[in-house]
Amino acid sequence: MKKENNYISTDVNHKKLIFGVVIIHICFLIIKNSGITDILKEKNIFYGVLINMIYQLTLIIMIGVAMKQYLITSFKKFKADRISVNIKRVLAGVGIAFLLSCIAGIIEMTVCSNISVPANQSNVNGYFVDYPILAVIMSVIMAPFTEEIIYRGILFRVFSKYGELCAVLSTGFLFGTMHMLSSFGNTNILLFLCQWLDYFLSGILFGFIYKKYKNIWINVSIHGTWNLIGSVMLLTKIMLTK
């Protein structure tokens, strides 16, 4: 089994930064989905984009300072593999993600008579309509990096003390739940569970990928490519409906 890089610095300040990254992530999602940011977005959707950009940049800076050596070491190992090998890994990961998404979609269509767009996705769609370039940057580059660092790079390590399978399941559960916070109380329970399942399965997949390769950049590459495909499809749909 591949050994994970020991990226947790002995520097107390760095440990505080890593802890702060997780806390800021949780607090931001709670505030974002409480309706407070919706008031600003109703005035101007750019405020929503701006808040998200500031949030992502803050996390990226904190992660860069606290986990610099881990990121550099992992990237060197990622670069050491042949490009063709990494491409195959990304394509395999995206292929499995597509299969899991199809399974979740079939279950949703079978179980739920009323199909609607998850609230999380609705917000993203609005950004793509008005600010497509910024939306792509956030969706394809920023979000995959910060989410993979938080769920696989930090929390996976925490839960792996109880076994790597526990880490995969726990981070998958948290990944799915955090993406569905905005739907709590806003939809029927069956629809909520079906939509949550899609994110949960994605989280489980990313967890197993990290368990196998122990390299965060492989996760970021697969996550980013998956989001890129979704972004292209969404932008194409927007262009065709104009």
Regions found by a protein language model. Give the residues of each.
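Juxtamembrane helix-loop-helix connectors linking adjacent transmembrane helices
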Residues: 42-47, 72-143, 185, 240-242
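Short, Lys/Arg-rich, polar N-terminal cytosolic tail immediately upstream
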Residues: 1-11
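Transmembrane helix-loop-helix hairpins at the membrane interface
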Residues: 102-105, 130-242
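Membrane interface segments of multi-pass transport proteins and intramembrane proteases
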Residues: 37-46, 112-116, 158-169
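Alpha-helical transmembrane segments in multi-pass membrane proteins
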Residues: 16-70, 119-126, 134
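Structural signal for the C-terminal ends of transmembrane alpha-helices
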Residues: 64-74, 209-213
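Juxtamembrane/transmembrane-helix boundary motifs at the membrane-water interface
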Residues: 27-52, 109-110, 183-191, 232-242
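Alpha-helical transmembrane segments
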Residues: 13-30, 92-97, 170-174
